[in-house]
Amino acid sequence: MSERNDRKVYVGKVVSDKMDKTITVLVETYKTHKLYGKRVKYSKKYKTHDENNSAKLGDIVKIQETRPLSATKRFRIVEIVEESVII
């Protein structure tokens, strides 16, 4: 059971929900440059499993690493942290 707790957990924004049971999540992180000490922003997109198609474009979601679900999917949704407001 402790293995499940060691899996990576990220918080990111849904940038695509066009696929069935799959969303694309953009995760932004900061790293410090070794020589200059400046914080540099990095971003990466993850394909994420969404069983109920509950996440929508613009939502902030928490995702967790899981077993490979397809050729590109390695994450699943844990919770929707904040729902987007469509104007």
Curated annotation (Swiss-Prot):
Pfam families noted in UniProt: Ribosomal_S17
Keyword annotations from UniProtKB, A to Z: Ribonucleoprotein, Ribosomal protein, RNA-binding, rRNA-binding
Record GO biological process: translation
The keyword Ribonucleoprotein is assigned to this record: yes
Gene3D superfamilies linked: Nucleic acid-binding proteins
Gene Ontology molecular function, alphabetical: rRNA binding; structural constituent of ribosome
InterPro entries: NA-bd_OB-fold, Ribosomal_uS17, Ribosomal_uS17_bact/chlr, Ribosomal_uS17_CS
Cellular component annotations (GO), alphabetically ordered: cytosolic small ribosomal subunit
Record NCBIfam families: PRK05610.1, uS17_bact
HAMAP family according to UniProt: Ribosomal_uS17_B
Its biological purpose: One of the primary rRNA binding proteins, it binds specifically to the 5'-end of 16S ribosomal RNA.
Summary of subunit composition and partner proteins: Part of the 30S ribosomal subunit.
Family label: Belongs to the universal ribosomal protein uS17 family.
Record-given protein name: Small ribosomal subunit protein uS17
Organism expressing this protein natively: Staphylococcus aureus (strain Mu3 / ATCC 700698)
